[in-house]
Amino acid sequence: VPNTESNILHQQVDLDRLNKNKDNDPITQKLIKEDKMLLFITLTQKCQLNCGYCGNGSNEDIEDIVAHNPEVIYDVNLIKKFNKVKDLAVCFYGGEPLLRIPLIEQIIPLLPNAKFCLQTNGVCLKQLKPEIVRKFNTILVSIDGDEATTDFNRGKGMYKMLIKHCKWLRENCKFTGDLIARMTCSGINDIYKSVTHLLNLGIFDHVHWQLDVEWDSDMDARYTNHLAEGFVDWKDRIYNVGITNLMKDFIENLKKGKVLGIVPFLGLIKIFIKGEKVKRILCGSGSDSFNITTSGYINCCPIAPEIDPIDDIRREDFDHKNLYDTELIAGFCQ
């Protein structure tokens, strides 16, 4: 990095926070010793869809959270610095990462020992080469439940397209990894019906979801409809009731020796079985999970671009071990 740019980078990154003494924290020392990291790589901020709950739509209540360059502007060969991580998992993220398939094909060989993951809206899945598909351990496809729910949120015909593309992964590409239905649960969802529908398709190994509540200046913006009178009403009458019914199904199946692939439940079950007190948030953001932005900065979470960068991959003295346990997330996430 030229000296002038290096000075700018040092101004952007809080080096005192990065280089703070972590020797006396046993949790931090354990993270450094294990050297296990989940690394998101945001390939673009662009997406070809206009989903109803996303900043690409016309809903004027949605805040503009895009704080980074729309496209990758750093030399992706710098990603090779993460080859020093002992146990590395890489997740391609966006925007829509499959709008930048050549970048994916360029990055995968740079990290020969990593495990790879993809989170995608599924539109361009069939543009991937089968040999690239088989490089992935996990593929998360955005689908919100049944056909009516998915098409309402993501556009007419999306549900049938996604089902077709997911079957293509299995049948044509011989993908044997973890295929996850990644829902955005919004005001039109009956969570019990949506999750049960996706599990019963026999296509997905797991179902995971995120609530559509944290991007709006008015949380009730999309929860006042024929189902509910605002978010709290929806949560109490529909969501919590559905979660309770899902848990009942989960327990009944456990008694029969079957574990339903409901991701939020599995994380909690693991904690109960291990009997460990959780001292960091479960997603690992800021402790052992990080994101390379399109600008080359490293922050703790790909869906929180407003958080200050922890480091910059372009710094000559970059050391991935300095990232561990740098950003202790609290507040809303905690």
PLM region descriptions:
Residues 304-334:
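Membrane-interface junctions of multi-pass transporters
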Residues 73-80, 84-91, 100-214:
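Radical SAM/AdoMet-radical enzyme domain recognition
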Residues 46-58, 300-303, 329-334:
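Local cysteine-cluster metal-coordination motifs and their immediate loop/turn environment
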Residues 10, 14-131, 135:
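Conserved alpha-helical substructure of the radical SAM core
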Residues 102, 302-305:
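Short clusters of small/polar residues that mark proteolytic maturation junctions
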